[in-house]
């Protein structure tokens, strides 16, 4: 029973790290300014880091 619990714990941690690597971008989660500048560069009004642990750069609509 303990082996199964440890397996699921490691699987959960691995999946969480994989999601973080895939979704992190444009400065998020540590540099919200980079996300904002990216959004400005694609002709949006700006942007911010949102989502789970602020890992997704979300741009404001024009």
Curated annotation (Swiss-Prot):
Tissue specificity field: Highly expressed in non-venom gland (hemolymph) and moderately expressed in venom gland.
Cystine connections: 28-49, 35-57, 39-59
Signal sequence coordinates: 1-24
Presence of the UniProt keyword Signal in the record: yes
Molecular function per GO: potassium channel regulator activity; toxin activity
GO cellular component assignments: extracellular region
Localization of this protein: Secreted
Ribonucleoprotein among keywords: no
Matches recorded under SUPFAM superfamilies: Scorpion toxin-like (SSF57095)
Function according to Swiss-Prot or TrEMBL: Antibacterial peptide active against Gram-positive bacteria (including S.aureus ATCC25923 (MIC=2.5 uM), M.luteus AB93113 (MIC=2.5 uM), and the antibiotic-resistant S.epidermidis PRSE P1389 (MIC=1.25 uM)), but not against Gram-negative bacteria (including E.coli and P.aeruginosa). Also has weak blocking activity on Kv1.1/KCNA1 (8.7% inhibition), Kv1.2/KCNA2 (10.2% inhibition), Kv1.3/KCNA3 (9.0% inhibition), KCa3.1/KCNN4/IK (9.1% inhibition), KCa2.3/KCNN3/SK3 (46.3% inhibition) and Kv11.1/KCNH2/ERG1 (16.9% inhibition) channels (tested at 1 uM).
Protein name as it appears in the record: Defensin BmKDfsin5
Organism: Olivierus martensii
């Amino acid at each position: 029973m303990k082996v199964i619990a440890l397996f699921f714990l490691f699987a959960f941690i691995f999946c969480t790290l994989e999601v973080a690597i895939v979704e992190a971008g444009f400065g998020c989660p540590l540099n919200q300014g980079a996300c904002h500048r990216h959004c400005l560069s694609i002709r949006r009004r700006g942007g911010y880091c949102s989502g789970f642990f602020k890992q997704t750069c979300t741009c404001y609509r024009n």
